[in-house]
Amino acid sequence: MPQQTIEELYEQALERKQNPQTGSYTDYLYQKGLDKILKKVGEESTEVILGAKNNNEELIYETSDLLFHLMVLLVEKGVSLDDIKDELGSRLGKKSLLHERADWRGDKKNEKDS
Protein backbone atom coordinates (compact mmCIF):
# COMPACT_ATOMS: atom_id res chain seq x y z
CA MET A 1 0.00 0.00 0.00
CA PRO A 2 1.43 3.42 -0.89
CA GLN A 3 2.18 5.76 1.98
CA GLN A 4 2.04 9.54 2.25
CA THR A 5 4.14 11.58 4.64
CA ILE A 6 2.91 14.54 6.66
CA GLU A 7 5.23 16.70 4.56
CA GLU A 8 3.60 15.45 1.35
CA LEU A 9 0.15 16.07 2.78
CA TYR A 10 1.17 19.62 3.72
CA GLU A 11 2.64 20.22 0.26
CA GLN A 12 -0.57 18.95 -1.33
CA ALA A 13 -2.63 21.37 0.79
CA LEU A 14 -0.25 24.21 -0.11
CA GLU A 15 -0.39 23.34 -3.81
CA ARG A 16 -4.19 23.35 -3.71
CA LYS A 17 -4.16 26.76 -2.02
CA GLN A 18 -1.77 28.19 -4.61
CA ASN A 19 -3.40 26.46 -7.59
CA PRO A 20 -7.07 25.90 -6.77
CA GLN A 21 -8.86 23.04 -8.47
CA THR A 22 -12.43 24.14 -8.91
CA GLY A 23 -14.83 21.63 -7.45
CA SER A 24 -12.29 19.95 -5.17
CA TYR A 25 -13.00 19.55 -1.47
CA THR A 26 -9.79 21.36 -0.56
CA ASP A 27 -10.73 24.31 -2.76
CA TYR A 28 -14.16 24.34 -1.12
CA LEU A 29 -12.55 24.63 2.32
CA TYR A 30 -10.26 27.45 1.24
CA GLN A 31 -13.14 29.27 -0.45
CA LYS A 32 -15.30 29.02 2.68
CA GLY A 33 -12.44 30.36 4.78
CA LEU A 34 -11.04 30.04 8.26
CA ASP A 35 -14.30 29.51 10.13
CA LYS A 36 -15.23 26.50 7.97
CA ILE A 37 -11.74 25.05 8.29
CA LEU A 38 -11.82 25.48 12.08
CA LYS A 39 -15.24 23.84 12.24
CA LYS A 40 -13.91 20.84 10.32
CA VAL A 41 -10.83 20.57 12.57
CA GLY A 42 -13.16 20.56 15.58
CA GLU A 43 -15.44 17.93 14.05
CA GLU A 44 -12.52 15.71 13.09
CA SER A 45 -10.99 16.06 16.56
CA THR A 46 -14.20 14.77 18.08
CA GLU A 47 -14.30 11.92 15.58
CA VAL A 48 -10.74 10.93 16.56
CA ILE A 49 -11.85 10.68 20.18
CA LEU A 50 -14.88 8.60 19.26
CA GLY A 51 -12.81 6.44 16.93
CA ALA A 52 -10.29 5.76 19.69
CA LYS A 53 -13.12 4.49 21.87
CA ASN A 54 -14.22 2.08 19.13
CA ASN A 55 -11.28 0.44 17.38
CA ASN A 56 -7.87 1.12 15.86
CA GLU A 57 -9.17 1.03 12.29
CA GLU A 58 -11.57 3.87 13.03
CA LEU A 59 -8.89 5.73 14.98
CA ILE A 60 -6.51 5.53 12.02
CA TYR A 61 -9.18 6.67 9.57
CA GLU A 62 -10.30 9.63 11.68
CA THR A 63 -6.72 10.64 12.53
CA SER A 64 -5.97 10.76 8.82
CA ASP A 65 -8.95 13.08 8.31
CA LEU A 66 -7.81 15.28 11.20
CA LEU A 67 -4.25 15.50 9.86
CA PHE A 68 -5.57 16.53 6.45
CA HIS A 69 -7.70 19.29 7.96
CA LEU A 70 -4.83 20.42 10.19
CA MET A 71 -2.62 20.78 7.12
CA VAL A 72 -5.31 22.88 5.42
CA LEU A 73 -5.52 25.02 8.57
CA LEU A 74 -1.75 25.51 8.75
CA VAL A 75 -1.62 26.52 5.09
CA GLU A 76 -4.57 28.88 5.52
CA LYS A 77 -2.82 30.56 8.46
CA GLY A 78 0.59 30.66 6.76
CA VAL A 79 2.19 28.32 9.30
CA SER A 80 4.81 25.97 7.89
CA LEU A 81 5.72 22.49 9.05
CA ASP A 82 9.14 23.91 9.89
CA ASP A 83 7.39 26.29 12.32
CA ILE A 84 5.79 23.28 14.00
CA LYS A 85 9.06 21.32 14.01
CA ASP A 86 10.87 24.31 15.54
CA GLU A 87 8.28 24.50 18.31
CA LEU A 88 8.52 20.78 18.97
CA GLY A 89 12.31 21.02 19.00
CA SER A 90 12.18 23.85 21.52
CA ARG A 91 10.30 21.55 23.88
CA LEU A 92 12.83 18.72 23.85
CA GLY A 93 14.12 18.06 27.33
CA LYS A 94 11.93 20.72 28.92
CA LYS A 95 9.36 20.09 31.59
CA SER A 96 5.92 21.10 30.44
CA LEU A 97 4.47 24.21 32.03
CA LEU A 98 1.37 22.11 32.59
CA HIS A 99 3.24 20.06 35.19
CA GLU A 100 3.86 23.20 37.22
CA ARG A 101 0.14 23.85 37.54
CA ALA A 102 -1.67 22.10 40.36
CA ASP A 103 -4.98 22.04 38.52
CA TRP A 104 -3.80 19.73 35.71
CA ARG A 105 -4.32 16.81 38.10
CA GLY A 106 -7.53 18.21 39.48
CA ASP A 107 -5.84 19.52 42.64
CA LYS A 108 -7.70 22.34 44.31
CA LYS A 109 -4.54 24.07 45.53
CA ASN A 110 -5.71 27.56 44.59
CA GLU A 111 -9.29 27.09 45.75
CA LYS A 112 -10.27 29.24 48.74
CA ASP A 113 -11.55 27.51 51.86
CA SER A 114 -15.31 27.77 52.23
From Swiss-Prot:
Q: Which Gene3D superfamilies match?
A: MazG-like
Indicate where this protein is primarily found.
cytoplasm
**What keywords are annotated for this sequence in UniProt?**
Amino-acid biosynthesis, ATP-binding, Cytoplasm, Histidine biosynthesis, Hydrolase, Nucleotide-binding
| Reactions that this protein is recorded to catalyse | 1-(5-phospho-beta-D-ribosyl)-ATP + H2O = 1-(5-phospho-beta-D-ribosyl)-5'-AMP + diphosphate + H(+)
- Note the InterPro entries from the entry: HisE (IPR008179), PRib-ATP_PPHydrolase-like (IPR021130)
**Associated pathway:** Amino-acid biosynthesis; L-histidine biosynthesis; L-histidine from 5-phospho-alpha-D-ribose 1-diphosphate: step 2/9
* Localization in the cell: Cytoplasm
Is Translocase set as a keyword in this record? Answer: no
Name the protein family.
Answer: Belongs to the PRA-PH family.
Q: Protein name, please?
A: Phosphoribosyl-ATP pyrophosphatase
What is the primary gene name for this protein?
hisE
